[in-house]
């Protein structure tokens, strides 16, 4: 006979709460940041054409021939040419992506940190306003964030591929059509994981940095605000810390995001990360090519992290209080 301890029950409950809170957070966050995501993808995927002239320093010169320029220009052009609903293009697959990703990410992160640092688990289970300020070590949060990023990326990646291809298609299309088109290419079902190496190169450090920055900023913020309002569940603190952690970590890995998006819509067999890096550098303007869509990408990442952390922390607190 197996005896279930109250500790085991609490652990199970906590995992389900984190999955539910993560799913809710992912769904709501995605809906809000969808327009910025569409703008970012359009900017990242457009090919920059430069003339082949060069000056005495062997630098490429000439005017860039591009369709989209900046957030406002791209957003207004997409609305004008494709309608305002196109800012939520591919939203079904994107919602599946974000719900799956956020649920796995938050629950995995908290489980790993809880194993490596039992004190953190005790702290997370407390919902009272008087709980003490606590931060796990940066090495532990880096491991937890990176591990959560790996697992959530692998599980949700096919939805990311489908979403990117839908957004890249200027004509009307849907989830089913796009799925069939992707697997009909050379490579079949493996195309649903095209560019995953670049994605993991991006996501491992990004999530490691993001959770580490978030825990650090939150600890500092709570240290100075909890003495004033006696509340380290302050949503404004969570939003601000999430905004900073998301924007900084995204900037650090932006080149890998550009390469990942290019590989996701690529139809050439044998065209990998190395070839993509080389083409971007030599054919599309050097180093700056790796920061295409950088502004909307960083703004979106900051806003997404701010909303995601806030929605997760607040919904988790509500769910735990209801038990």
From Swiss-Prot:
Which spans are transmembrane here?
15-35, 96-116, 142-162, 191-211, 239-259, 293-313
| Solcar repeat residues | 13-115, 136-220, 233-318
Which BP terms from GO are recorded?
thiamine pyrophosphate transmembrane transport
Q: Which domain of life is it from?
A: Eukaryota
Q: Which residues form the signal peptide?
A: none
**Reaction equation(s) it catalyzes:** thiamine phosphate(out) + thiamine diphosphate(in) = thiamine phosphate(in) + thiamine diphosphate(out)
How does this protein sit in the membrane?
A: Multi-pass membrane protein
Coiled coil: which residue ranges?
Answer: none
**Any Pfam family:** Mito_carr
Concerning its family, UniProt says: Belongs to the mitochondrial carrier (TC 2.A.29) family.
Described function = Mitochondrial transporter mediating uptake of thiamine diphosphate into mitochondria. It is not clear if the antiporter activity is affected by the membrane potential or by the proton electrochemical gradient.
Q: What is this protein called?
A: Probable mitochondrial thiamine pyrophosphate carrier
The gene it comes from is mcfK
């Amino acid at each position: 006979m197996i005896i279930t301890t109250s500790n085991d029950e609490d652990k199970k409950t906590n995992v389900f709460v984190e999955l539910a809170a993560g799913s809710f957070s992912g769904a709501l966050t995605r809906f809000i940041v969808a327009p910025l995501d569409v703008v970012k993808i359009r900017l990242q995927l457009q090919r920059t054409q430069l003339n082949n002239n060069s000056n005495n320093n062997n630098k490429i010169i000439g005017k860039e021939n591009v369709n989209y320029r900046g957030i406002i220009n791209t957003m207004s052009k997409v609305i004008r040419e494709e309608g305002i609903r196109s800012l939520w293009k591919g939203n079904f697959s994107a919602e599946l992506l974000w719900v799956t990703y956020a649920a796995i990410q938050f629950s995995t992160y908290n489980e790993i940190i809880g194993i490596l640092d039992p004190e953190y688990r005790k702290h997370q289970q407390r919902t009272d306003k008087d709980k003490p300020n606590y931060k796990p070590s940066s090495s532990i949060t880096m491991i937890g964030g990176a591990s959560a990023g790996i697992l959530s990326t692998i599980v949700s990646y096919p939805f990311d591929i489908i979403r990117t291809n839908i957004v890249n298609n200027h004509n009307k299309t849907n989830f089913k059509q796009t799925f069939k088109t992707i697997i009909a290419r050379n490579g079949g079902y493996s195309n649903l994981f095209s560019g995953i190496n670049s994605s993991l190169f991006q996501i491992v450090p990004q999530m490691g940095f993001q959770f580490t920055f978030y825990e650090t900023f939150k600890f500092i913020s709570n240290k100075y605000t909890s003495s004033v309002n006696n509340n380290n569940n302050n949503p404004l603190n969570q939003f601000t810390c999430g905004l900073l952690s998301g924007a900084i970590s995204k900037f650090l890995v932006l080149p890998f995001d550009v390469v990942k998006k290019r590989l996701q819509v690529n139809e050439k067999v044998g065209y990998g990360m190395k070839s993509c890096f080389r083409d971007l550098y030599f054919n599309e303007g050097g180093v700056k090519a790796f920061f295409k869509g950088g502004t909307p990408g960083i703004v979106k990442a900051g806003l997404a992290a701010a909303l995601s952390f806030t929605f997760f922390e607040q919904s988790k607190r509500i769910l735990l209080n209801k038990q």
